[in-house]
C-alpha cells in the first residue's frame, strides 16, 4: 500500500492559498460593496444585521448608481479613495465586473458569483493565517443598459459556510467533523457556533456598521496573540467555494477507503501490447464511427474501449472529434459514461458536435446557473421521441465494415510489386519488369525475329557479326563473277548440280565442251565415243574451283540476315542492346504482363475508392444504430417509468424550476438510463452525483493537463475505467481549486506561489506513464498555413505532427507591427496597447471583421490595459465583435487574454501583444519552468493569421542564451515571425522533415522526361515545382497558379509493404489532403511510359475541375 498522505497534505496546503482561505485584497474578480450598499442600495437598514435580514427575506438587492452623483470629490476621496467622479468610476467598475463575470461563466460554465459576508481573520493552531468571508450567498448580477443601475438576484439555495477554513482545520487535525450549519438561511451566529465546535473564537466588532475591506499582508498579523476577528465587510466576487465539494469527496475517500487510491492510480501499463502490431493488424471490428476519423483518431477510439487510456492531443489534432466518437462507441456498447473537463468550452464543443444525436448526453456544466437549459434537454428529448418514434425503428441491424479492403489494397500493391520485380532474362542479363516498362523507348524492332526472348543476347551476337557481313558481300561478288563466267547464274547452278551428281569425268568434260559451243547445259548419261579436249579439261578445273568457292560462301548468302545485321550496325544494337531489348520485349512479348499491370493499378484505384465509400456508408449505418439506441432509451423508460419520465420532461414548462441537485438525487438511476453520457464540470459531477465507487463504467476527462491529481481522484473513483485526454506539452494546472480566470497570474508569479503548481502533477502527467495505453493524435487541422504550426512542431513536438497548407490558405500569414516609442513600464506597454486597439478598429472596416479574432498578451496587466482601452473606446463594432457567437451558440467573440487563459481557444486571427521591450531579462510566466508549454499554447491558437506587436527587433531581445527554455523559444519565435513576415522562411531551418528516397537512374530519367513534358505543355500557364515539401508531406510535382496549389502529383509512388503503410501513408494521407482542399492525382511511371497522351489528358481534366472549384470560391 502506498502512502498517499503527501497528496492530502499538498491538497490541504494548497487550500490555504485560495481566496476562500486567504484574501489579502480585492482584485479584478472581487469588489468591495460595503460603501455602495450604504450609498446607493435600496436597503434602509445598512448595518450588517439589516443586510442579512434583507437577504433572508427578499429575492433581489437593487443599487442605483446615479445616487453617487451627489457625492462630491472630497467625500468620494474620503469614502472610496477616488479622486475623480465616484459615479463614473463605479459605473465603469460595474461594467467591467459584469463583463468579467460573463467571461468567467463562458469559460467555466459556472458564475460562482457570491455575496460574501462578513470577513473572519486570524491564525489557526497550525500557524496558518486566514482571512476570508464567513458566509457565501449565491447571486446573479443584472445590469441596466448604461450600467446606471444593477441588482443582485439572490439564490437562497446556494448558501455556504466557508468550507475551506473548516476543511483545512479538520484535515490537519485528521478528525471527522460534521458541518451542521443550516444552509437554508444566512445566520452569522449559527455560523460562528460551527466554528466554536472547532475551538475558534472571534472578537466581534463594536458596532454592526458595514466596513470597507482593507488591504492586508500576512506580516500584519500578530502571531503571538493569535486573536481572531470578525469584520463587517461585504464583498461581491467570484469564489470557487462549490469546488470544495471535490475537496470533501477526496477526504471521504481517503478516510474511508485509502486503499482504493492504490487501485485508482496503479501502474496499468500493458507490457505485452505491441503498438506496432496493433497498428499493423488494425481494423474497425467492434468499433463504430460517428464521423470519418483519420487513422490516428481511429486508433484512439478502438483503444479507448479497452479503458485506462491516455490520448495525447496536440493543438488542432481533432481531440474533441475523437472524444465524440469515443462517447458514441461507449453508448453503443451499453456503457454509462461521465465526461468532465475543467473548461466548459471543451464540454460545449463535444456536446454540440453530437448535433441531432445529442440525446445520448445530459449536459450540465453548472449546478445553479443553467436550470432552464438543463430541463429543456428533457423536453427536447420528448419532442425528438414523438417526432421520430416508430416501432420498426426500435430494431436495427448492427453495422459491419468490410476490413478486407485494406488487405485487398495491400494485396494489389504486393502483386504490383511482384510484377515490377519479375525478372526478364535476355540470355546473359536479368532486368526487372519495372525497369523495362519504365525505360523502354518506342523503337522499330519489328525486324527482330525471335520466339524466345531468352535468346536475345545470342541473337545480337549472331546478327552483329561484321565477318558475316564481309562474307556475304564476297558471296555477292562471287555470284556476279559466276554469272558472267557461266553466262548466267542458272547455268552455274546446273553445272554445279551436275558436278555434284556425276562422278564420270568424261561426261562432265563433254557437258562443259558442249556448254562452250552452244551455251546450254545438257545432261547426257553416256558419252561413249567422246574424247575430252584440253579446253574441256580447263573448263572442268575452273568449274570445280568455282563450286568450291561458292560452296564455302553459300552460308552467307541470306539477304534477310544481311539486312538484319546491317540494321543492327546502323542502330548500334551491338554497342547498346538494352534499349532494343526493352522496346522489342514490350512490343512483342509483354502483353500478358502489361494486362496484369493495368489490372493491378486499376484495382488499387477502385479498391481505395471502395474503402472510402465503405467508410461513409459505415458512418451512416452507425448513426442509424445510434438513433435507434436513443429512441430505445426513451421507449424503455416510457414503458417502465412513464410517470417519472414525463414528470421530469414537463419540468421545463414550470415557472419555478426545482433545483438540479434535487432531481439528480431523486432520479439519478433514471437519468443514467435515459442519458448514458453525463457531461459536467468536475465540480458539477462532485455536487450532483454520489461519491460512490463504480458509479459509471467509464470516465472521460478532457484537458487533463489542467486538472490537478487531487481534483481528479473523486472523479476517477466514480468509474471503473478512465480515458484521459490532453497534452502534456500544454499548460499544467493553474492553481488548486481555482480556474485560471480567477487569479492574478502576475501576482502569483511575483510571489513565487505558482512554483508549487509548476512542480505539481496534473492528472495527465501523473498517469501518462501509468496508463495501460498511450496514443498520439498526429494530423493537425487547425492552422490553414503550415507556417503557423511549423515552429511548435519542430521545437515542441519533435516533428511528430502531420500538417500542411490548406490549398486556399491566405498568403499573408504573419504580420509584424513594430511599435514606435513603446516602453515597458509598470508591467505594461501603453503605446503598444494603443496600437493594438487602433489595429482592432482598423480591422472592423475590412473583411477580417467577419472572422474570429483573439488578442493574447504575455502579461496580465497588458491584457487588462487593452481591455480597458477597448472599453473606453466603446466602439459598437468592437462591442459586437466581442459578444459574437456561432450558429450553435458557442462563444467565438473577440477576446483579450493572457497566455495562462487561452488553452482550448482558437480564432481565425491571433494578435500578440508582447509588451516587453529589450530592457527586460525575464518574461514573466514564459521564463519560469514550463514556460515553453505556455508559449506553445499561445502560438498554436491561430487558424489563418498571426499579427505580432512588439517594441524592438527580435534580435535585440534577451533570451537566446538564457537557461530558461521558455525565454529562448520566445526570442526564437520573434525571429521566426519576422522572417516569415518578410517572406524569408527559407532561412528558417526548422521546417518539416524532408523525404529521403533513393531512386534508380532509369526512374530519375523518366521523371526528368515527365517534368520536361509538363513544362512544355503547361509551363506557360502554371508554375510547376518539382520535389515539393509541403508541411509534413512530399510531392513529386505541384502546379501553382498565383501561388495557389492547383494540382499535386505523386509520380512513381513507393509501394507500401504493410497494412499500416496503406492506412497511414496512402488512404489517410489522401483523405487528409482532401480535407486540406488539395487536388492530388497518382501517375504510375509505367502509365506515363505506356500512355503519355492519356496521362496528359488526365492532368488537364484535374486542373479544369480544380480551376472551377476556385472560381466557385
Curated annotation (Swiss-Prot):
Keywords of this entry: ATP-binding, Helicase, Hydrolase, Nucleotide-binding
Source taxon at top rank: Bacteria
Coiled coil: none
Classification via InterPro entries: DNA2/NAM7-like (IPR045055), DNA2/NAM7-like_C (IPR041679), DNA2/NAM7_AAA_11 (IPR041677), DUF4011 (IPR025103), P-loop_NTPase (IPR027417), SF1_C_Upf1 (IPR047187)
Positions bound to ATP: 313-320
EC class (word): hydrolase
The enzyme's E.C. designation: 3.6.4.-
Gene Ontology molecular functions: ATP binding; helicase activity; hydrolase activity
Family as reported in the entry's similarity comment: Belongs to the DNA2/NAM7 helicase family.
Name this protein carries in UniProt: Uncharacterized ATP-dependent helicase MG140
Amino acid at each position: 500500500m502506498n502512502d498517499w498522505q503527501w497528496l492530502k497534505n499538498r491538497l490541504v496546503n494548497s487550500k490555504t492559498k485560495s481566496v476562500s482561505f486567504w484574501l489579502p485584497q480585492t482584485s479584478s474578480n472581487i469588489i468591495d460593496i460595503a460603501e455602495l450598499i450604504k450609498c446607493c442600495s435600496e436597503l434602509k437598514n445598512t448595518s450588517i444585521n439589516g443586510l442579512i435580514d434583507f437577504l433572508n427575506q427578499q429575492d433581489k438587492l437593487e443599487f442605483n448608481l446615479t445616487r453617487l452623483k451627489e457625492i462630491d470629490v472630497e467625500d468620494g476621496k474620503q469614502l472610496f479613495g477616488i479622486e475623480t467622479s465616484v459615479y463614473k468610476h463605479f459605473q465603469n467598475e460595474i461594467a467591467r465586473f459584469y463583463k468579467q463575470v460573463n467571461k468567467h461563466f463562458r469559460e467555466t460554465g459556472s458564475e460562482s458569483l457570491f455575496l460574501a459576508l462578513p470577513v473572519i481573520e486570524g491564525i489557526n493552531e497550525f500557524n496558518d493565517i486566514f482571512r476570508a468571508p464567513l458566509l457565501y450567498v449565491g447571486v446573479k448580477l443584472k445590469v441596466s443598459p448604461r450600467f446606471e443601475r444593477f441588482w443582485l438576484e439572490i439564490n437562497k439555495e446556494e448558501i455556504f459556510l466557508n468550507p475551506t477554513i473548516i476543511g483545512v482545520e479538520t484535515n490537519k487535525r485528521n478528525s471527522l467533523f460534521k458541518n451542521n450549519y443550516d444552509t437554508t438561511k444566512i445566520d452569522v451566529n449559527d455560523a460562528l457556533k460551527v466554528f466554536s465546535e472547532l475551538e475558534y473564537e472571534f472578537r466581534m466588532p463594536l458596532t454592526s456598521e458595514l466596513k470597507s475591506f482593507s488591504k492586508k499582508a500576512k506580516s500584519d498579523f500578530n502571531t503571538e496573540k493569535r486573536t481572531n476577528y470578525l469584520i463587517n465587510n461585504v464583498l461581491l466576487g467570484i469564489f470557487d467555494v462549490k469546488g470544495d465539494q471535490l475537496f470533501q469527496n477526496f477526504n471521504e475517500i481517503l478516510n474511508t477507503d485509502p486503499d482504493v487510491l492504490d487501485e485508482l492510480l496503479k501502474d496499468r501499463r500493458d507490457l505485452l501490447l505491441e503498438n506496432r502490431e496493433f497498428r499493423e493488424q488494425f481494423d474497425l471490428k467492434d468499433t463504430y464511427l460517428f464521423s470519418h476519423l483519420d487513422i490516428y483518431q481511429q486508433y484512439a477510439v478502438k483503444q479507448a474501449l479497452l479503458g485506462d487510456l491516455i490520448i495525447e492531443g496536440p493543438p488542432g489534432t481533432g481531440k474533441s472529434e475523437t472524444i465524440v466518437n469515443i462517447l458514441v462507441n461507449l453508448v453503443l456498447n451499453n456503457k454509462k459514461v461521465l465526461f468532465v473537463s475543467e473548461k466548459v468550452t471543451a464540454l460545449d464543443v463535444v456536446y454540440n458536435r453530437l448535433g441531432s444525436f445529442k440525446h445520448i448526453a445530459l449536459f450540465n456544466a453548472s449546478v445553479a446557473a443553467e436550470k432552464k437549459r438543463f430541463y429543456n434537454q428533457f423536453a427536447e428529448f420528448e419532442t425528438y421521441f414523438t417526432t421520430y418514434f416508430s416501432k420498426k425503428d426500435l430494431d436495427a441491424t448492427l453495422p459491419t465494415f468490410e476490413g478486407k479492403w485494406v488487405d485487398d489494397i495491400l494485396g494489389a500493391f504486393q502483386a504490383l510489386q511482384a510484377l515490377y520485380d519479375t525478372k526478364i532474362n535476355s540470355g546473359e542479363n536479368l532486368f526487372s519488369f519495372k525497369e523495362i516498362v519504365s525505360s523502354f523507348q518506342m523503337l522499330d524492332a519489328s525486324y527482330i525475329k525471335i520466339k524466345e526472348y531468352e535468346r536475345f543476347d545470342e541473337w545480337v551476337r549472331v546478327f552483329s557479326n561484321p565477318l558475316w557481313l564481309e562474307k556475304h558481300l564476297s558471296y555477292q561478288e562471287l555470284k556476279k563473277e559466276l554469272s558472267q563466267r557461266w553466262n548466267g547464274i542458272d547455268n552455274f547452278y546446273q553445272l554445279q548440280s551436275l558436278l555434284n551428281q556425276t562422278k564420270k569425268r568424261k561426261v562432265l568434260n563433254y557437258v562443259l565442251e558442249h556448254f562452250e559451243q552452244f551455251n546450254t547445259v545438257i545432261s547426257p548419261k553416256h558419252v561413249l565415243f567422246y574424247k575430252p579436249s584440253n579446253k574441256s579439261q580447263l573448263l572442268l578445273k575452273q568449274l570445280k574451283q568455282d563450286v568450291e568457292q561458292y560452296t564455302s560462301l553459300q552460308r552467307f548468302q541470306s539477304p534477310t540476315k544481311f539486312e538484319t545485321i546491317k540494321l543492327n550496325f546502323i542502330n548500334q544494337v551491338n554497342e547498346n542492346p538494352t534499349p532494343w531489348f526493352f522496346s522489342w520485349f514490350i512490343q512483342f512479348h509483354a502483353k500478358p504482363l502489361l494486362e496484369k499491370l493495368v489490372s493491378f493499378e486499376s484495382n488499387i484505384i477502385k479498391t481505395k475508392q471502395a474503402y472510402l465509400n465503405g467508410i461513409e456508408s459505415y458512418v451512416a449505418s452507425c448513426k442509424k444504430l445510434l438513433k435507434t439506441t436513443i429512441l430505445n432509451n426513451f421507449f424503455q423508460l416510457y414503458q417502465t417509468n412513464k410517470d417519472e419520465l414525463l414528470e421530469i420532461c414537463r419540468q421545463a414548462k414550470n415557472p419555478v424550476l426545482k433545483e438540479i441537485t434535487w432531481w439528480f438525487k431523486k432520479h439519478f438511476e433514471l437519468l443514467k438510463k435515459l442519458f448514458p453520457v453525463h457531461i459536467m464540470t468536475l465540480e458539477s459531477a462532485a455536487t450532483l452525483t454520489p461519491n460512490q465507487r463504480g458509479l459509471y463504467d467509464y470516465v472521460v476527462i478532457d484537458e487533463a493537463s489542467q486538472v490537478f491529481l487531487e481534483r481528479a481522484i473523486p472523479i476517477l473513483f466514480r468509474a471503473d475505467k478512465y480515458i484521459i485526454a490532453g497534452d502534456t506539452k500544454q499548460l499544467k494546472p493553474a492553481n488548486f481549486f481555482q480556474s485560471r480566470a480567477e487569479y492574478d497570474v502576475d501576482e502569483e508569479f511575483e510571489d513565487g506561489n505558482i512554483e508549487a503548481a509548476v512542480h505539481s502533477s496534473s492528472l495527465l502527467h501523473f498517469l501518462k506513464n501509468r496508463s495501460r495505453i498511450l496514443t498520439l493524435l498526429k494530423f493537425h487541422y487547425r492552422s490553414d498555413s503550415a507556417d503557423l504550426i511549423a515552429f511548435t512542431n519542430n521545437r515542441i513536438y519533435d516533428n511528430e505532427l502531420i500538417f500542411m497548407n490548406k490549398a486556399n490558405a491566405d498568403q499573408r500569414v504573419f504580420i509584424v507591427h513594430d511599435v514606435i516609442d513603446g516602453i515597458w513600464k509598470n508591467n505594461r506597454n501603453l503605446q503598444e496597447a494603443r496600437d493594438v486597439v487602433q489595429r482592432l478598429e482598423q480591422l472592423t472596416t475590412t473583411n477580417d471583421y467577419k472572422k474570429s479574432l483573439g488578442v493574447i498578451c504575455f502579461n496580465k496587466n497588458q491584457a487588462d490595459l487593452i481591455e480597458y482601452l477597448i472599453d473606453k473606446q466603446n466602439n459598437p463594432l468592437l462591442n459586437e465583435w466581442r459578444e459574437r457567437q456561432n450558429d450553435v451558440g458557442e462563444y467565438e467573440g473577440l477576446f483579450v487574454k493572457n497566455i495562462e487563459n487561452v488553452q482550448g481557444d482558437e480564432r481565425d486571427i491571433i494578435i500578440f501583444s508582447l509588451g516587453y521591450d529589450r530592457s527586460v531579462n525575464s518574461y514573466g510566466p514564459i521564463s519560469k519552468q514550463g514556460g515553453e508549454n505556455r508559449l506553445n499554447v499561445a502560438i498554436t491558437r491561430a487558424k489563418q493569421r498571426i499579427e505580432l506587436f512588439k517594441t524592438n527587433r527580435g534580435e535585440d531581445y534577451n533570451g537566446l542564451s538564457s537557461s530558461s527554455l521558455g525565454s529562448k523559444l520566445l526570442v526564437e519565435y520573434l525571429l521566426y515571425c519576422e522572417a516569415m513576415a518578410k517572406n524569408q522562411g527559407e532561412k528558417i531551418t526548422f521546417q518539416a522533415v524532408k523525404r529521403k528516397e533513393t531512386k534508380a537512374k532509369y526512374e530519375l530519367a523518366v521523371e526528368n522526361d515527365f517534368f520536361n513534358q509538363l513544362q512544355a505543355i503547361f509551363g506557360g500557364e502554371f508554375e510547376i515545382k518539382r520535389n515539393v515539401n509541403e508541411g509534413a508531406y512530399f510531392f513529386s510535382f505541384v502546379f501553382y497558379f498565383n501561388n495557389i496549389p492547383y494540382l499535386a502529383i505523386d509520380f512513381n509512388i513507393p509501394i507500401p509493404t504493410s497494412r499500416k503503410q496503406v492506412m497511414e501513408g496512402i488512404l489517410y494521407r489522401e483523405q487528409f489532403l482532401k480535407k486540406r482542399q488539395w487536388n492530388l492525382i497518382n501517375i504510375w511511371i509505367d502509365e506515363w511510359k505506356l500512355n503519355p497522351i492519356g496521362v496528359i489528358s488526365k492532368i488537364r481534366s484535374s486542373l479544369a475541375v480544380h480551376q472551377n472549384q476556385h472560381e466557385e470560391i
